[in-house]
Design a protein with these regions (language model features):
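An aromatic- and glycine-enriched ligand-binding surface/loop that stacks and positions planar moieties
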Residues: 8-68, 137, 161, 169-170, ...
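A glycine-rich, coil/turn loop motif that links secondary-structure elements
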Residues: 111-117, 180-192, 242-244, 435-438
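Sec-dependent bacterial lipoprotein signal peptides
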Residues: 1-6
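Long, intrinsically disordered, low-complexity segments
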Residues: 88, 163, 246-302, 385, ...
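C-terminal substrate/ligand-recognition segments
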Residues: 320-423
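Conserved, well-structured interaction surfaces
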Residues: 28-45, 65-134, 149-162, 168-182, ...
Length: 531
């Protein structure tokens, strides 16, 4: 696995302080430590929290994590503290500082290019992510300077994306396809290709669904980039979906293309305690910080490929049977046996009538009646110190990017069903061969596959933004299980617990506001429309 112990030591000290004292950036080992220090800037497990920004999940605390809860409900403003979680010019400074120091180093060219590829990948990803949230943003290139010092105005979003693409192109050129030994887990050529494919998919979506313009060349490029990842012949789907989200899979699977790296007892995260309610797992500890919505749970298909509203297989008394296999591997579901602190397995029963620790609105009980198994190890003794890596890109996404892009510009291409069917086969679902050429239906299928495959991986929010469906799916409450405990738990016609009200204003919510704190320091920053 990627050795980050040097990184952890390095982060104990200020790298700028080290540089100014002329005690750093002398050797190849120094450069590697400097680059390692950038890896924690990659998106990590907190992206699981951010699935609450979509229609997949709700935060149990209406305020939540410095205002993330406000964003999730659509009641945030320019003063909301959580905006700074994505407005990351301190990260841009650190990345450019590292790049600037590298350029002046005399080390082996092959190593120098590899380090540059890693740095430029992280730089491209940071700018891409900020542009997705804020649209037009200041663009600082090559030389490290603070945003306040530069006092730059905002550059057009496309100019920012073009610069990000320039950087990811160099990453593709410089990065190796694979690593060995302690370097396994570092950023690869495949990861860089995935980032670029992701960017082109996003640009194509905005051009088509927001601007109503032809985007054929953008879709074509997204498909071509995904195909290049496929043609590397390095990746495949794991047979067991659940395995991917356990520590045993860390750098030990064929599907993950890039992940945020964690280490037992050194670099850890708290997803198990956040994903669990009270009373489950070997410790019984759980905060139920975020809960899946009824809409998400109900959207999983039956094994005949139909919805629960259409299929004759659906049984309200046994609603989790004959469903997409990912359903039981992603969620704790009412009535399904779950591990308890005494080692027994008893049904998870969150309805308040049962007075269990996991009951709705109990402290640590959640608000919808559903909880997460994904990224949650119920046998873990230290539930606030998980070391399961957090995936940024998986081969399943490669296949679905390929299928989505092909469907938009060449809907009769048989490669579409080839790609989609692989993902569906693992989930125990039938193929979609009969839908080839039905662009609208295939579009819906692919979108649902993305929703179910990437729960908790912070894909859904960006998807509903780029598809321009956020104004529909986020303008409705997030519901939970049925209120009447005497009705079948799968009876979707009954009144449900209201988890949270939500709102989405299409006149402004497709972009976040520029943080007021940033505008106070830089008067050249204008605000986004209607904020």
């Amino acid at each position: 696995m990627l050795t980050l112990s040097g990184c952890a030591d390095f982060l104990d000290r200020d790298p700028l302080e080290q540089a100014s004292a002329n005690t750093f950036w002398k050797t190849e080992a120094d450069v590697e430590k400097g680059v390692n220090a950038l890896y924690p800037l990659l998106p990590g497990e907190r992206d699981f929290w951010r699935d609450c920004e979509s229609d997949n999940s709700l935060m149990t605390n209406s305020w939540g994590e410095n205002g993330l809860g406000y964003i999730c409900q659509g009641i945030h403003n320019a003063a909301t503290g959580y905006l700074s979680e994505e407005w990351k010019y301190d990260h841009i400074y650190r990345i450019l500082y590292c790049l600037d120091k590298l350029q002046g180093m005399e080390i082996k060219e092959e190593k120098k290019q590899r380090f540059e590829g890693e740095i430029r990948f992280i730089l491209a990803l940071k700018y891409y992510r900020m542009a997705r949230h804020f649209g037009d943003i200041p663009l600082i290139k090559e030389k490290p300077v603070s945003l306040e010092e530069a006092a730059l105005p905002r550059s057009p979003k496309q100019e920012v994306l073009d610069y990000a693409i320039e950087n990811v192109n160099k990453a593709i050129e410089y990065l190796p396809e694979t690593y060995s030994g302690d370097d396994v887990g570092r950023i690869t050529k495949g990861a860089a290709l995935m980032l670029k494919a992701d960017m082109y998919l996003d640009m194509a979506s905005y051009k088509k669904f927001h601007q109503g313009e032809e985007a054929k060349e953008l879709w074509k490029e997204a498909a071509s980039l995904a195909k290049k990842v496929i043609d590397l012949n390095l990746y495949g789907l794991e047979n067991d979906f659940a395995f991917l989200f356990k520590a045993a899979a860390n750098n030990n699977n064929k599907e993950v293309i890039l992940a945020h790296q964690y280490m037992e007892d050194e670099l850890t995260h708290m997803l198990p305690v956040l994903c669990s309610p009270s009373g489950v797992g070997v410790t019984g500890r759980g905060w139920a910080s975020f809960c899946p919505t009824r809409d998400l749970v109900d959207s999983y298909e039956m094994t005949d490929g139909k919805t629960i509203y259409e299929s004759s297989l659906y049984d309200m008394e046994h609603p989790w049977e004959n469903r997409d296999a990912r359903l039981k591997k992603t969620f704790m579901l009412p009535g399904v046996d779950i591990l308890r602190p005494d080692g027994s397995y008893t049904p998870y029963m969150p309805h308040p009538a049962y007075n269990n620790p996991e009951r709705i609105n109990n402290e640590g009980g959640g608000i919808t009646g559903y909880m997460y198994l994904k990224y949650n190890d119920l046998e873990l003794e230290k539930v606030d110190a998980s070391w399961t890596n957090f995936s940024l890109y998986r081969y399943a996404e490669t296949l679905l990017i390929y299928a989505e892009a092909l469907n938009e510009y060449e809907p009769y291409n048989a490669e579409i069903v080839w790609a989609v069917n692989q993902v569906r086969k693992r989930a125990g679902l039938p193929g979609v061969d009969s839908q080839l050429g039905n662009q609208e239906r295939m579009r819906t299928i692919i979108r649902e596959e993305r929703r179910h495959e990437f729960v908790g991986e912070h894909k859904r929010y960006f998807d509903i933004l780029r598809w321009k469906t956020a104004e529909v799916v986020l303008n409705q409450p997030g519901y939970g299980i049925n209120k009447d405990e005497h009705t079948a738990i799968g009876d979707y016609t009954q009144e449900k617990f209201l988890g949270q009200e939500r709102t989405f204003d299409p006149q402004k919510h497709y972009l976040w506001p520029i943080p007021q704190s940033a505008r106070d320091k830089n008067p050249n920053l204008t605000q986004n429309p209607n904020w």
